[in-house]
Curated annotation (Swiss-Prot):
Changing N82Y: Impaired MCBA production. No change in hydrolase activity. It holds the Pfam family CBAH. Homotetramer. The tetramer consists of a dimer of dimers. The active site is at C2 (nucleophile). This is Bile salt hydrolase/transferase. Pathway: Lipid metabolism; bile acid biosynthesis. Possesses dual functions in bile acid metabolism. Acts as a bile salt hydrolase that catalyzes the deconjugation of glycine- and taurine-linked bile salts, which occurs naturally in the intestines of humans, releasing amino acid residues and deconjugated bile salts (bile acids). Can hydrolyze the amide bond in major human conjugated bile salts, such as glycocholate (GCA), taurocholate (TCA) and taurodeoxycholate (TDCA). Shows a slight preference for taurine-conjugated bile acids as substrates. Coiled coil: none annotated.
């Protein structure tokens, strides 16, 4: 599961982030990698050297960093979301192509490119390969949302047919089916409105709304990918932007909280609870990574620009899931 979101504030800042909906912890922490840093996979000997500094949520496996979402020093953000059934990775490298292991795709994007347009150009010759980070750890079925400080966003999906790159003017991504299906599905909700429905005369009977919100009657409320896509797309569009960036930051979290999963509400066939482990929000211009967790609603912030971008080591920040309460008496 998972939901991705990108939006622009009234002052022209760009916020990008996601809900991480998963039934288990993956030992995640916030990871900072300086520019010009060489990452070497001990298992398959593949290497990657960062052109740009990277900050995001992920895990380090045998000294090699992998990311669920993050951004780089140039204001390019990327998030990987579950994409079951439809995804089809290449089984082997293709000669003449840029072959990218699945686990490395997000880091490859953030380490090498400064804009969505640069990524789109590079993807014209890319091949996403089903090479795991380790023989004991299979790849996750993923598609990716990528956004930058120009406000442009794309979705990258590798299916049986080809590697698809969609322009994302909606600013939202969830899971399967494919992104173009979700966009077409928006047409089913053309009748939704943000304003209250006026009184209606049904023959001689006057019908009056009994409460606010009648304009969005029919907005889906379940946790399926299709319903979450619709709900976030409309809430994003309805959002009233504020003169204070801090308020828009809070609005970002409120939108994603509207599709956050409560423990027990969404159970897998194995009776495990799919829940929103964390919500992230990155200010792409400022280089600040904000997040809160299922156990702790307090917003945490890590500022990339307070780190040494030319450092010589990876730095991690502990994932904060300890409940914090502001006692006022």
């Amino acid at each position: 599961m998972c939901t991705g979101l990108a939006l622009e504030t009234k002052d022209g800042l760009h916020l990008f982030g996601r809900n991480m909906d998963i039934e288990y912890s993956f030992n995640q922490s916030i990871i900072f990698i300086p520019r010009n840093f060489k990452c070497v996979n001990k298992s398959n000997k593949k290497e990657l050297t960062t052109k740009y500094a990277v900050l995001g949520m992920g895990t380090i496996f045998d000294d090699y960093p992998t990311f669920a979402d993050g951004m780089n020093e140039k204001g390019l953000g990327c998030a990987g979301l579950n994409f079951p059934v439809y995804v089809s990775y290449s089984k082997e490298d293709i000669e003449g192509k840029t072959n990218i292991p699945v686990y490395n795709f997000l880091l490859w994007v953030l380490a090498n490119f400064s804009s969505v347009e640069e990524v789109k150009e590079a993807l014209k010759n890319a091949n996403i390969v089903d090479i795991p980070i380790s023989e004991n750890i299979p790849n996750t079925t993923l598609h990716w949302m990528i956004s930058d400080i120009t406000g442009k966003s794309i979705v990258v999906e590798q299916t049986k047919e080809k590697l698809n790159v969609f322009d994302n003017n909606i600013g939202v991504l969830t899971n399967s089916p494919t992104f173009d299906w979700h966009v077409a599905n928006l047409n089913q909700y053309v009748g939704l409105r943000y304003n209250q429905v006026p009184e209606f005369k049904l023959g001689d009977q006057s019908l009056t709304a009994l409460g606010q919100g009648t304009g969005l009657v029919g907005l889906p409320g379940d946790f399926t990918p299709a319903s979450r896509f619709i709900r976030v797309a409309f809430l994003r569009d309805a959002m009233i932007k504020n003169d204070k960036d801090s308020i828009d930051l809070i609005e970002f979290f409120h939108i994603l909280n509207n599709v956050a999963m409560v423990r027990g509400s969404t159970r897998t066939v194995e009776e495990k609870s799919d829940l929103t482990q964390y919500t992230s929000c990155m200010c792409l211009e400022k280089g600040i990574y904000y997040y809160n967790t299922y156990e702790n609603n307090q917003i945490n912030a890590i500022d990339m620009n307070k780190e040494n971008l030319d450092g010589n080591e990876i730095k991690t920040y502990k994932y904060n899931k300890t409940l914090s309460i502001n006692h006022v008496n």
